Swiss-Prot record:
Gene3D superfamilies: Transcription factor, MADS-box. GO terms for biological process: positive regulation of transcription by RNA polymerase II. Residues 132-144, 201-241, 587-600 have a biased composition (Pro residues). Interacts with MAPK MPS1. InterPro entries: MADS-box/MEF2_TF, MEF2-like_N, TF_MADSbox, TF_MADSbox_sf. Residues 180-195, 456-465, 554-567 have a biased composition (Polar residues). It is found in: Nucleus. It comes from Pyricularia oryzae (Rice blast fungus). Transmembrane segments: none annotated. Residues 86-96 have a biased composition (Acidic residues). This is MADS-box MEF2 type transcription factor MIG1.
Length: 702
């Protein structure tokens, strides 16, 4: 008569398991609700499904319940799977539970991840629960505040099966609880993260968890770091002096750590505190707290300082092409270094030298790299930035080859930074802009061209390419402007005394070819004459520079005139009626000046097919001159205050028959025109239609 009992074992079929899960989960939540209402108790149910989804029911505020559970004393009653071996209750999704609190667990009843350890000492369990944060199944119970009693049987591996009773709530408790320490890795605490990361087997066998400092600051967010309690060889008392300090550091770690315990998979070093130090790599504020611990932990400082080194390189590498950004970044790493290592500073100068040598190879700029290497403390890199401008002048001459390499290497470095704009060495727009914006600097640098004029004449294209890269450097940062000057002197070809021809020679390879045909087609005559006159004058003045300078000066002057006329050309184009055809242009420009209707011959425009005309002109395709009709279009309806529309053509043609006849369409459209507009059309329509239209026009106007 009663319900059929099923055997309580894992369901293999996925479909049956999902259906059973949904039904029993709903029933469990319903029972929990009934229990909470009937007995006025607080109930919280957590279910971690096999799909890693979390299902929960809580009769009140879940965070409050979790906090109360976390800080509560030992459970009065605790049930696990062993209590329901033959029963109907189901915990099938997670299966395993923690042992009852008061009696030891038999070996045959232990879950698989408890097999390797003996029964729990009750006093350890009692000490464990008051400050409980990590679940017991992970095998890392912790000594509470004053007790240094590490358990001797904790090294079992973490398994995916989680206990379904109180430890699930505890595992869930940390992410949801209102404790002050924010989550770092997004999971509740380390034991749950170890499901996805490497297991906690890397911990030393007798290492209690990092939670020990007590309830006010649960630290589960810093999972896999073997915490402060000492390694088994050390007696518990070394832990005591470090505990308050470690607690403070853990608090700071939870608030400031920006990396989700990426260094945790490393096997922990002998001291527990160092595992924490490994995690606190990024925030430099924590390092002052490490200072008191340096004497016992000098061997640890070096592994701890090793993670920040790639970090400092990453900090410096993106802005290296920009000298401005480089010097402030150089200031920061020494500060980190001094904060991190008050005592072992031996590796730091070497690291700085390596960093600066890499910077020197990437931007071979000797005036900057040598002071930066010789002065490791923070202020001198600022001096490097300020000193760059004067020393670059004497150092220009020996550096053209270095600048070539710098121009080639800069784009690679700039790609590493998100803050730098598009690579200037590869931006064609910046090349053309720099060609004109950098001309004053070129003119300044043309006198030094005496030194290089002999070697430069043979390769003007190379000089132009080099100057192209140089102009990007000038645009990027002021200190690089001095560095760019050698390029300018290279690009100013043998005509050194004349500063005017130097810019044309510079932009020869960039702009020489294409603009000339454009000049012939687009530039009006008077402007082209001016441009050609200036070009010939410049070429005559630069005759000593050779044929190449003549050509480049002409091309550059043409480019200048072309750039000035580009802004002049577009306005006349809409109103140039000589270029307009009736079918091709569409509606006219209403703001264009009216053209006298006498230039276009009527025969020229009638040839356009009717299909090419706009639809509103289809009734009037045989007007003698549509091109003269367009400018008058918007002024046609001035008398009756109506905008033009196709209906204006159709309505007058009431009794005149089909509208496609040649005799009637012009008349039909002209019937509604005012005498003023007819006078405008007068020169075109000198045919007999006008005389015939006179009486009709009088009728319409009256």
């Amino acid at each position: 008569m009663g319900r059929r009992k099923i055997e309580i074992k894992a369901i293999k079929d996925d479909r049956n398991r999902s259906v059973t899960f949904l039904k029993r989960k709903g029933g469990l939540f319903k029972k929990a609700h009934e229990l909470s209402v009937l007995c006025s108790v607080d109930v919280a149910v957590f279910i971690f499904g096999t799909n890693k989804k979390l299902y929960e029911y809580s009769s009140g505020d879940m965070r409050e319940l979790i906090t109360r559970y976390t800080y509560h004393g030992g459970a009065t009653e605790h049930k696990g799977p062993s209590d329901f071996n033959g029963g109907d209750d189901d915990d099938e999704e997670e299966g395993d539970g923690t042992p009852p609190l008061d009696q030891p667990m038999d070996a045959h009843m232990m879950p698989p991840h408890f097999q390797g350890q003996g029964p729990f000492p009750p006093h350890v369990m009692r000490h464990y629960t008051p400050s409980a944060s990590p679940p017991i199944p992970n095998g890392v119970p912790f000594p509470p505040h004053g007790h240094g009693v590490p358990r001797g049987h904790t090294p079992q591996p973490q398994m995916l099966s989680r206990p379904g009773s109180r430890n699930d709530a505890r595992r869930m408790g940390q992410p949801m609880g209102p404790q002050g320490s924010p989550q770092v890795n997004g999971f509740g605490f380390g034991q749950q993260q170890s499901m996805y990361g490497p297991p906690n087997t890397t911990m030393p066998p007798h290492m209690p968890p990092q939670m020990a400092p007590g309830p006010p600051f649960p630290y589960p967010q810093h999972p896999q770091h073997p915490p402060h309690p000492p390694h088994p060889p050390h007696p518990p008392h070394p832990q005591q002096p470090h505990q308050p300090q470690m607690q403070q550091q853990f608090i700071e770690d939870g608030r400031r750590a920006t990396m989700p315990a990426n260094f945790a998979p490393h096997p922990p070093p002998p001291h527990g505190p160092m595992g924490m130090q490994r995690h606190s790599v990024s925030p430099p504020q924590q390092h002052p707290h490490h200072v008191p611990q340096l004497p016992p932990q000098q061997p640890q400082q070096h592994p701890h300082s090793s993670p920040p080194q790639p970090q400092h390189h990453q900090m410096q590498s993106p802005p290296q092409p920009m000298v401005k950004f480089e010097s402030p970044q150089q200031i920061e790493p020494p500060q980190h270094q001094h904060q991190q290592q008050p005592e072992p500073q031996e590796p730091r100068p070497e690291q700085q030298q390596q960093q600066q040598q890499s910077q020197q190879s990437q931007q071979p700029q000797e005036p900057q790299s040598e002071p930066a290497r010789s002065l490791p403390p923070p202020p001198p890199p600022l001096e490097v930035k300020t000193e760059l401008a004067p020393p670059a002048q004497p150092g220009r001459i020996p550096q053209p080859s270095l600048l070539d390499t710098a121009v080639k290497k800069l784009p690679r470095q700039k790609q590493h930074s998100i803050f730098t704009p598009i690579d200037e060495n590869r931006s064609i727009l910046s090349q053309h802009l720099a060609a004109f914006h950098a001309e004053p600097s070129k003119n300044k640098s043309s006198p030094p061209a005496h030194h290089r004029s002999s070697s430069v004449d043979e390769s003007t294209s190379n000089a132009s390419e080099a100057s192209r890269g140089k102009d990007k450097d000038i645009a990027s940062s002021p200190p690089l402007l001095k560095r760019a000057d050698p390029r300018a002197s290279i690009s100013s070809v043998s005509s050194a005394p004349e500063s005017a021809p130097a810019p044309p020679s510079r932009s020869n390879s960039l702009r020489a070819g294409p603009p000339r045909p454009r000049l012939k087609v687009q530039i009006p005559d008077e402007q082209s004459e001016d441009g050609s006159g200036s070009a010939t004058a410049e070429s005559a003045s630069s005759a000593q520079g050779g044929a190449s300078t003549d050509a480049t000066s002409q091309s550059t002057r043409q480019n200048d005139s072309h750039s000035s006329t580009n802004m002049v050309l577009p306005p006349p184009s809409p109103s140039a009626s000589a270029l307009l055809s009736a079918g091709a242009t569409g509606p006219p420009n209403p703001f264009a000046p009216k053209r006298p209707p006498q230039h276009p011959a009527p025969g020229l425009n009638i040839d356009t097919p009717v299909s090419a005309l706009p639809s509103r002109f289809l009734n009037n395709e045989f007007l003698p001159s549509p091109s003269s009709f367009y400018p008058d279009w918007n002024f046609r309806g001035g008398d009756n205050n109506t905008l033009p529309s196709p209906l204006n053509f159709a309505t007058p043609v009431v009794g005149t028959g089909p509208s496609f006849l040649r005799d009637e369409n012009p008349g039909a459209s002209l019937k509604r025109k005012s005498p003023d507009n007819l006078s405008i059309h007068g020169p075109i329509s000198d045919n007999p239609l006008e005389a015939g239209n006179e009486p009709k026009r009088v009728k319409v106007d009256s």
